[in-house]
Amino acid sequence: IANGVPHNNWNLLQARFIMNVGLVLEDNKEYADGKGREYYIDYVMNRSSIRQWSLTRLADYGFDINTGIWAECPGYSSVVINDYANFVNQFDTNLQYDLVKAMPVLSKAVATTPQYLFPNRMICGFGDTHPGYLSTNFFIRMIQNAQANGKKEQENYFTALLKCLNPDLGNDKTEKKNVRVSVNSFFEDKPLTLNPKVQPGKIEDYVSPLFYAPNVSWLV
């Protein structure tokens, strides 16, 4: 909290560490300084200092409210959106708190990520970005958030998008192969079940020939 970089993706690296520590602590009343589980979770979500901004302040600063685009190059943007999506899952799983409802720009930011794609479905590599394929983890997190909070429209939208970009996801072999093993799995991961009735979307539904993102001063 005392050190770090507050206004870009590094802020989220710090917030993730603080959040993981906070989740394993006892309640505030169990500590002489009053800094327990509630203190650190509240700090991540709502409080800012010179070197560490809250999730809400950072989102207000970095996301374009109209386009959902994060104000860095696609590589860093994907990392930031993925970190926010993982926070969504942590809040759902451990706190029964809908972070997407509290911060609607997150859903828009995830939905906008296909705009980074070239026709070969690799992301454009402007700035400090290496061309590669778009991560689909944040789509999974939006589906899990929708399932946890009864949001069928959101679930159907991101399920169709996920099936469009990753048609192999959903079969048993792929799911077993992609099981993550890390300390975060104690707080986040639950098996993903996709609605088989939702058909894959068409790529044309998620991209446009020209997309203007003024906060990165680029035509994507």
Where are these regions (language model features)?
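Carbohydrate-active enzyme catalytic cores, enriched for enzymes
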Residues: 76-220
